[in-house]
Amino acid sequence: MTLSSNQYQLPLNVRPYTTTWCSQSPSCSNLLAIGHDTGITIYCASEEQTPGSTGLTLQELFTIQTGLPTLHLSFSSSCSYSENLHDGDGNVNSSPVYSLFLACVCQDNTVRLIITKNETIITQHVLGGKSGHHNFVNDIDIADVYSADNRLAEQVIASVGDDCTLIIWRLTDEGPILAGYPLSSPGISVQFRPSNPNQLIVGERNGNIRIFDWTLNLSAEENSQTELVKNPWLLTLNTLPLVNTCHSSGIASSLANVRWIGSDGSGILAMCKSGAWLRWNLFANNDYNEISDSTMKLGPKNLLPNVQGISLFPSLLGACPHPRYMDYFATAHSQHGLIQLINTYEKDSNSIPIQLGMPIVDFCWHQDGSHLAIATEGSVLLTRLMGFTRL
């Protein structure tokens, strides 16, 4: 499988900071969000109409005005799409209506939950101030928690920042409930586990990778102010002794990001800024006796990665695992505008990178696994991946 030069490019008249697909919502999986200097612009991907083409194109739908640069974004799985709704006068509205739930980070270091009907903001929770982060916020993710009768009980937002803190923001009917968890260095990435929203993976700049269950200490969180609480981490890994055995550079072990891999989060992929990457399989050979899904307790032999390697270039943007094939991930060199596809289980599988000729800001996979959205300083591109079939 290789990246193709078959690309669709859409010029932007804003400065982008981040991009993400609405991949968790079945009805909105073709929506792409660009966070930029004045807000969030939503695009819809559709099949290209050119005869013989199998690519996607983008159509701008609307812009949600936040009034500040939007630096990080995450869609809730509660996002939905509907048609032929009636307005207040009983008339049929033929325009599509997107009900969106977006967690975002703005330049003032606030974390926000924005609920919209198309571009109209219905509700906006601004979470910050004295009870929020006291420095730059580096990543954010959102998860929906359902009750026993399959109703949405609350939405949970996780954020990490340069203040060496992970904050869990629970949005309930009674208002936001916050809890802070100290880290040993600045937090650079955070992600809920796909198969269990109670569990989080957190990456720290010093190479620490931590997993914990945020529900284990709820009694300490039942207050309206952020309080640093002691929560038992389920698992801690560290890239420092692993990558320094083959790299002497001081930046070798500085983590770029860490992500779950597999649709159930059965593995971990960590990318260092030097280009070194490491992969852990939490459930090797489906032997669930080696590790408990609920407690994440590992034996000593599991602390070492199952496989590791290095990309063709350093990466400040980290790794983006393929949504369907857990052996593959994409990485990028932001300054030189390079995108590379790597197979973790094929030795020397480094593919020839695509050179875009412009700095890369962010990139992410479409849920179908055949297209990569790439935000550059002046445009957004959809690059088709040759060799992967679409769903």
From Swiss-Prot:
Single Gene Ontology BP annotation: nucleocytoplasmic transport
Cell membrane keyword on record: no
GO cellular component, one term: nuclear pore outer ring
Sorted UniProt keywords: Cytoplasm, Nucleus, Repeat, WD repeat
Domain of life: Eukaryota
Subcellular location(s) of the protein: Cytoplasm; Nucleus
Matches recorded under Gene3D superfamilies: YVTN repeat-like/Quinoprotein amine dehydrogenase (2.130.10.10)
SMART domains, alphabetized: WD40
WD repeats: 137-179, 182-222
Cited InterPro entries: NUP37, WD40/YVTN_repeat-like_dom_sf, WD40_repeat_dom_sf, WD40_rpt
Protein name: Uncharacterized WD repeat-containing protein C4F10.18
Organism of this sequence: Schizosaccharomyces pombe (strain 972 / ATCC 24843)
